[in-house]
Amino acid sequence: MLADAQALVYNLSELMPTQYQKENLEAMLGLFLEAQGNPLPEHSKIKSASALSRFLNINPWSTRNIIRTIRTHTLKQVFSESLKGSKPFLQVIIDLTTLEKCGKFQEYEQLISVYNKKRGLHLVVLYLVVGKWRIPWSFRVWRGKGSPSPAQLGLKLVKRLPQELKSNFQVMILADTAFGSREFLHGIRKLKLYAITGVAISRKLIDGRVLKHIHRPDFSR
């Protein structure tokens, strides 16, 4: 896996239009690969925080090419990790992640909202589980009330999974209670996929009973 990661870093570096931007990218990747919990630009020992800020916000380089390269590499890893023979399972995790923000952000005002009493940027992220690794594949920003719900965004991400994954794997969707809506579950079923999600105890069954009142069987006997 280390050799594959090194190859990916090299391919990403080659996408940079100048040597200066290539060095900035390598400095940013170094912060994450150190895994010290300090990936912010000011912790870089190679480049200044202002240089990395310009690289991320001003310098012209193709985000699409970066995403395309990473996804191609990810698919290669998925297929290399799959077992030969019968159609293997592929776990797809959908998670709602909040990046809490304080203060005012005029340029991102439409992206900052409150969810579960947390103010910030709320991301619906889709991960592919490859061996021991959980690799982010795609994401959408929940924009607050009046916009598509996290469950609706999660369903859109699932629908946009590459067909080659759906054709070669038994895709198993794993998600928490934020994605346990009827629309999400029926949508997954229409796609002929499988899903395991959390369901709030306040949900009602067809017969009117509340989930939390259902008798729990005694397995000790």
Identify the meaning behind each predicted range.
Residues 1-67, 71:
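Gly/serine-rich nucleotide phosphate-binding loop at the start of the catalytic core
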Residues 101-108, 137-138, 184-186, 208:
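Short, conserved acidic/polar surface loops in the N-terminal third of protein domains
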Residues 40-44, 48, 88-99, 126, ...:
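Short, conserved catalytic/metal-binding motifs centered on acidic residues
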Residues 62, 135, 180:
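Short phosphate-engaging motifs
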Residues 28, 37, 49-52, 89-96, ...:
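A common structural microfeature
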Residues 57-131:
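Active-site-proximal, Lys/Arg-enriched surface segment
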Residues 141-221:
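An internal, acidic/charged active-site-proximal segment
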Residues 54-55, 59, 113-168:
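Electropositive, glycine- and tryptophan-enriched low-complexity nucleic-acid-binding patches
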